[in-house]
Amino acid sequence: MHLVGVLDIAKDILKANKRLADKNRKLLNKHGVVAFDFMGAIGSGKTLLIEKLIDNLKDKYKIACIAGDVIAKFDAERMEKHGAKVVPLNTGKECHLDAHLVGHALEDLNLDEIDLLFIENVGNLICPADFDLGTHKRIVVISTTEGDDTIEKHPGIMKTADLIVINKIDLADAVGADIKKMENDAKRINPDAEVVLLSLKTMEGFDKVLEFIEKSVKEVK
């Protein structure tokens, strides 16, 4: 197949996904649900961050999660233990969630009984960037253990983020990561995104993530 044909197919796929994403967002708005798409590589700390958010927000908000994984229900089972309603989504060989899959997951949730929806995307820093799920905010989680050049190597996904979380700052010295460089890279690539330096071991910076969630709720509602 010629390159032009391949590009046309890709454009059609993204266009169809955008229509479904807008449909998902309209449905969430109708029911007053504020949704967040958590993106990041495997091991960046997405699941643990979501668990901590559930623990700290569940007394104030009714929370549900959609957990994307290539196989099994590992992350979904972890989140359920923290008291959230969780819908697992297995993507098989696909490296990202899409609006079609999320739309089906929404059918398994009673949206009238949900205030916040946390969607954990498949662990990947490339594919998820192009596929709007219908969420209101996108959060990208990067860890110092991935290397301090990870942010500048993945500008595409960084440009889509509303919040960039630089996680595992407590391990920066051990792995030789320059936190300031990572922070500067994030701000240079996406000046509009908020940037938070985080350690889920010491909980440094976690209050700023909570503030972002709370502020987002006020913006959307």
UniProtKB/Swiss-Prot annotation:
GO terms for biological process: protein maturation. Keywords: GTP-binding, Hydrolase, Metal-binding, Nickel, Nucleotide-binding, Zinc. GO terms for molecular function: GTP binding; GTPase activity; nickel cation binding; zinc ion binding. Zn(2+) 2 binds at residues 100, 104. Signal peptide: none annotated. It comes from the Archaea. Ni(2+) binds at residues 95-96, 127. Involved in the maturation of [NiFe] hydrogenases. Required for nickel insertion into the metal center of the hydrogenase. Exhibits a low intrinsic GTPase activity, which is essential for nickel insertion. Belongs to the SIMIBI class G3E GTPase family. HypB/HupM subfamily. This is Probable hydrogenase maturation factor HypB. It comes from Methanocaldococcus jannaschii (strain ATCC 43067 / DSM 2661 / JAL-1 / JCM 10045 / NBRC 100440) (Methanococcus jannaschii). The gene is hypB.
